[in-house]
Amino acid sequence: MNLLDYLCQKESVSSVITSDRIKIGGTTDAWNMMLMACDFYQGNASVFVVLPNLYLAQNYYDELIAFMPEEDVLFFPSDELVSAEMIAATGDFLFERIQTLYTLLEGRKKMVVTNLHGAIKYELPLSCWQNNIFKLKQNDSVSIAELLKRLVRLGYEAVYTITKTGEFAHRGSI
């Protein structure tokens, strides 16, 4: 039995998780993460963890995937201020957000870690996401023009040469 399983079985932890109103102070981040993980595994719904800034959100995500299966934890980043060093990472953030939204549409419960800006940032309506999801299989026949339009609608960027995550290139005949 690991530490997480042990804590989730403790009556004191269960009473904290099931309480409608409770105020907890003076705890460590590690304890808070354990409580969130217990809440996630004992509950029937996704858990959203909103932290004040991107740095803390990234740290929580990294710590959570250290003791929870990585497929149960999603990262939904949003950069508040884009510095010169962060411009290259912005595409990675966009792809991470798209992947998180796509995974949430599958309907299985997940723990989603984000920062405040990520939680309040405007997103496309649910119907728009659902209408634009598609899967390609080997030997499928698709319209290239329609495929390119759909990729752009989903947030991918059309470029001549791919240099970062979230870009795609269309090559003509040779």
Model-found features: residue ranges?
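ASCE RecA-like P-loop NTPase motor cores
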Residues: 1-174
